[in-house]
Amino acid sequence: MRNLFIALMLLFSSIAFSQTVENNKKTVQQPQQIESKVNIKKLSENEECPFIKQVDENGNLIDCCEICCNPACFGCLN
């Protein structure tokens, strides 16, 4: 009888623990990643780019506005 009681306690405690983990997993949010993607999308759709034309390492003229308006883009500097 004692072994049955211990087995039931272990079973219910593991179920309760796994349910707690599942509940906590649902509350984790990642708004920063979503916000970051939206900002990059808005920047890339911006037609009034503050970037000036740049020259690459081969001497070719690069219009950064044609590439993107995101300041993190390679070769695009103010």
Swiss-Prot record:
InterPro entries: Heat-stable_enterotox_CS, Heat-stable_enterotox_STa
Disulfide bonds: C64-C69, C65-C73, C68-C76
Pfam families linked to this entry: Enterotoxin_ST
Tagged with keyword ATP-binding: no
Subcellular location: Secreted
Signal sequence range: 1-18
Positions of the propeptide segment: 19-61
Main subcellular location: secreted
A GO cellular component annotation in the UniProt record: extracellular space
Keywords of this entry: Disulfide bond, Enterotoxin, Secreted, Signal, Toxin, Virulence
A single GO molecular function term of this UniProt record: toxin activity
Protein family per UniProt: Belongs to the heat-stable enterotoxin family.
Identification of the protein by name: Heat-stable enterotoxin ST
Organism (species): Vibrio cholerae
